[in-house]
């Protein structure tokens, strides 16, 4: 299961198995809130119903790199806020408990999104 944008902008979920996209959905389609940054149970349940329970969660950025960027930018409060750490954020979704999280390089996730949704082999 890939999770993108959750916590701060345009939350989305995808399920990919053996290079095939089994499910892709945006939180805003479920909540009817434009650019919704919060995942919701309906979206996650649909993802699991279509693609099966994931064996790993691929998170769209490395949280410690983000915290370092916030520190360098002088965003002291944000850099110290642990409520936005993916492991804590995902605790509110029981269907994702005990699934390991693998953190990805943020810009690589953008590239993967373009690659996997393109019509080219």
Tell what function each PLM region has:
Residues 1-121:
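Short acidic/glycine-rich loops and adjacent helix/strand connectors
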């Amino acid at each position: 299961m890939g999770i993108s944008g959750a916590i701060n902008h345009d939350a989305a979920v995808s399920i990919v198995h053996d290079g095939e996209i089994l499910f892709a959905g945006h939180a805003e389609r479920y909540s009817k809130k434009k650019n919704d940054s919060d995942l919701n149970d309906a979206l996650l349940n649909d993802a699991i119903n279509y693609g099966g329970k994931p064996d790993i969660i691929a998170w769209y950025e490395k949280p410690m790199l983000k915290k370092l960027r916030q520190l360098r930018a002088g965003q002291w409060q944000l850099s110290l806020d642990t409520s936005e750490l993916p492991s804590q954020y995902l605790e509110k979704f029981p269907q994702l408990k005990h699934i390991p999280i693998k953190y990805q390089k943020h810009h690589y996730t953008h590239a993967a999104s373009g690659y996997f949704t393109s019509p080219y082999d």
